[in-house]
Regions:
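The structured alpha-helical core of multi-pass membrane proteins
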Residues: 1-622
């Protein structure tokens, strides 16, 4: 049993390599090279090389090993992670205003994540394919077409899911990290003087003696920890233990060996700054390394794509984005999903970015602001969790978290110097995402307020129907309702136009809780309102996809048996009109109306058979 358990743990750890560490693991392709980019004013002198490698070492140790692996991974919600989860965890049982503020921080984090998701696949695959220029400069014109082809194919096969090919991700990344370690270790053996960079005085002296150059250079140094957020975001899939084991036993040693190896190469040959990663390898290994690097960056891109699907689904269920099609690509893994609209929007953004920036060096300017912004928000939310849930004292939070926040904010400030050179791009994507999410949330609140204002109290309505019932027809009718307090508009319109009532009426409200998963026992609240009337409130976690079939199974456990094929579903379809009434700016109302018109119908989202649905329109002025 123990041997089998150990094998299972190792399999999960191997799988985590392919998903969690793809982005972080491909940073050696460009991070050190960009730290010596000409505009930064730092030359690859022995002192400069030791200073930068020292900064890399301590950045990885502080940000990844200490902050994320030791601290942030502790802040799980039933095993789940991610910045929205952290915001939900921090805001739980807080007053409404404080809760709204913390959830807003979570939304900003989601926006920054989406901004980062457009940059990561572009810079990763582009930096790998640029190895062609190292093999032979004549191949330079083919870099962009090959990069675009690889990414178009990757996005084009997303609807098949990653269940099959995903099994190869772990072994490929295992080989990748092994090659990173071997190349670095060999070069360190040739020039062990680079190991002096472990001494933090090299980093501190550089920052003290050349503060201006050091500050700007930090904007490139942070590239060595891009992708760290994935450790926390993917915790629900692989577990804290597997992620920590993979980091400590393989990923961290491989990354450090490779960065130190690149530094050793530069000490020996400063001209290798042209592309220190590829020049670590002997010429006969250049082409196989190019193939392996491209595979590794495709895997890193896949992790970002899957992460974006997951974050968008979470935002949809929490009511921050309109409903859209969510396809499950695996019968066994609930987390493996495909969102067609997100897929093609993401690809469109990536293609525009690649054509605009043309090279990984130009793209590096756009990379960093979103990453460091997310890191700073994570630390802020972590401080709230530490105070409220872990019961840390103020002095302990000040001792542990305040220095981490200072590091995050320093990196963020350093990256703002790249704003005009390209840093504006992920911020633009982030602002657009935040605008869409806040507009949708506010719009739905306005719609719900107006529907409740126009409707009748449920209890009084049921009493009236029992006292003076209309014509009863056989069968069961389910009325989907957004509120548990009032009568659904579909019911009022049905009585107004058809003047009939079914023998059994169920008012169904689906609510998303601020927990990731709920047990089957927590699925429904069933209330018998009177003869022939039932109210069902179905609860789902924000990581679950609401299922009508599961709701009816839970009802059957409570002796309310409902057969989908013999049930009629009544829904109200809102026709929204933008007006000058108070609520939202006119242009935001227009955006909300457009999103509402193009959102997935409730029938499709809940997979209700179309031939069992009756839709009744309601006109609402915003």
């Amino acid at each position: 049993m123990n041997h089998g358990h150990q094998q299972g743990h190792m399999a999960i750890t191997l799988a985590a390599l392919g998903v969690v560490y793809g982005d972080l693991g491909t940073s050696p392709l460009y991070a050190l090279k960009e730290s010596f980019a000409g505009h930064l004013g730092l030359q690859p002198t022995p002192a400069g090389i030791l200073s930068i490698v020292s900064l890399f070492f301590w950045t990885i140790m502080i940000v990844v090993s200490f902050k994320y692996v030791l601290l942030v991974l502790r802040a799980d919600d039933k095993g789940e992670g991610g910045i929205l989860t952290l915001a939900s965890l921090a805001s739980r049982r807080l007053p409404a205003r404080s809760r709204a503020l913390l959830m807003m921080l979570g939304l900003v984090g989601v926006g920054l994540f989406i901004g980062d998701a457009v940059i990561t696949p572009a810079i990763s695959v582009l930096s790998a394919v640029e190895g062609l220029q190292v093999i032979t400069p004549e191949l330079a014109p083919f870099v962009l077409p090959i990069t675009l082809t690889v990414l178009v194919i990757l996005f084009g096969v997303q609807h098949y899911g990653t269940a099959g090919i995903g099994r190869l991700f772990g072994p490929v990344m295992l080989l990748w990290f092994g090659v990173l370690a071997a190349l670095g270790a060999y070069e360190i053996g040739q020039n062990p003087a680079i190991l002096q960079a472990i001494n933090p005085l090299y980093a501190l002296d550089f920052m003290a003696s050349r503060p201006g150059v050091a500050f700007i250079t930090l904007g490139a140094v942070v590239l060595c920890v891009t992708g760290t957020e994935a450790l926390y975001a993917d915790m629900g899939h692989f577990g804290r233990g597997a992620i920590r084991l993979a980091w400590g036993s393989l990923v961290m040693p491989a990354l450090l060996l490779n960065y130190f190896g690149q530094g050793a190469l530069l000490l020996r040959n400063p001209a290798a700054i042209e592309n220190p990663f590829y020049l670590l390898a002997p010429s006969w290994l250049a082409f196989p390394l190019l193939i392996l690097a491209t595979l590794a960056t495709v895997i890193a891109s896949q992790a970002v794509i899957s992460g974006t699907y997951s974050v968008v689904r979470q935002a949809i269920l929490l009511g921050y984005l309109p409903r859209q099609e969510i396809r499950h690509t695996s019968e066994h893994e609930i987390g493996q999903i495909y969102l067609p609209l997100v897929n093609w929007l993401l690809l469109g953004g990536i293609v525009i970015v690649i054509l605009w920036f043309q090279s990984s060096s130009n793209l590096a300017a756009a990379y960093g602001i979103a990453v460091t912004g997310t890191m700073a928000l994570t630390t802020l939310l972590l401080m709230v969790v530490a105070a409220r849930r872990w019961k840390w004292s103020r002095w302990l939070i000040a001792l542990v978290c305040a220095p981490l926040l200072l590091v995050d904010l320093t990196f963020f400030a350093a990256n703002t110097t790249k704003f005009l050179a390209g840093g504006w791009l992920p911020i633009l994507f982030a602002l657009l995402a935040i605008l869409v999410m806040t507009t949708w949330k506010r719009g739905r609140e306005l719609v719900l307020d107006k529907l409740e204002h126009k409707s009748l109290a449920l209890k009084g309505f049921v009493d009236n129907m029992q006292a003076d019932p209309p014509l009863l027809v056989p069968g069961t009718a389910v009325f989907l309702s957004k509120s548990v307090q009032v009568v659904p508009h579909a019911m009022l319109h049905n009585l107004k136009h058809n003047k009939i009532l079914h023998e059994r009426v169920i008012f169904l409200t689906v609510q998303i809780k601020d927990e990731p998963w709920l047990s089957f026992k927590e699925r429904i609240e069933l209330t018998h309102l009177g003869e022939g009337f039932w109210q069902v409130v179905a609860h789902f976690g924000y990581k679950e996809v609401p299922s009508m079939e599961e709701i009816f199974q839970a009802c059957a456990q409570e002796d309310l048996k409902v057969t989908m094929a013999k049930t009629s579903f009544f829904l109200s379809h809102e026709h929204l009109v933008s007006t000058d009434l108070p609520g939202m700016a006119r242009w935001r109302e227009g955006l909300f109306v457009w999103m509402n018109r193009n959102s997935l119908k409730a029938t499709d989202f809940f997979h209700i058979p179309a031939n069992r649905v009756v839709e009744l329109g309601v006109l609402l002025e915003l």
